[in-house]
UniProtKB/Swiss-Prot annotation:
Pfam families: DUF7429. InterPro entries: DUF7429. The lineage of its organism: Viruses, Duplodnaviria, Heunggongvirae, Uroviricota, Caudoviricetes. This is Gene 60 protein.
């Protein structure tokens, strides 16, 4: 299940819930970059 938060048509955060799968999925470099960028953006909005 994927939950996205959008403001003015721009996605500001996306959370993916994975129920039932026990296997840990390895993060690709693209996933790691997207995660870091998302964290950076959220920290900037909180300040």
């Amino acid at each position: 299940m994927n939950v996205s938060f959008k403001i003015l048509g721009y996605e500001i955060a996306s959370i993916e819930f994975d129920f039932g799968e026990d296997d840990e999925r390895e993060l690709t470099p693209l996933d790691k970059g997207r995660k870091a960028l998302s964290r950076w953006w959220v920290r900037g909005m909180v300040k």
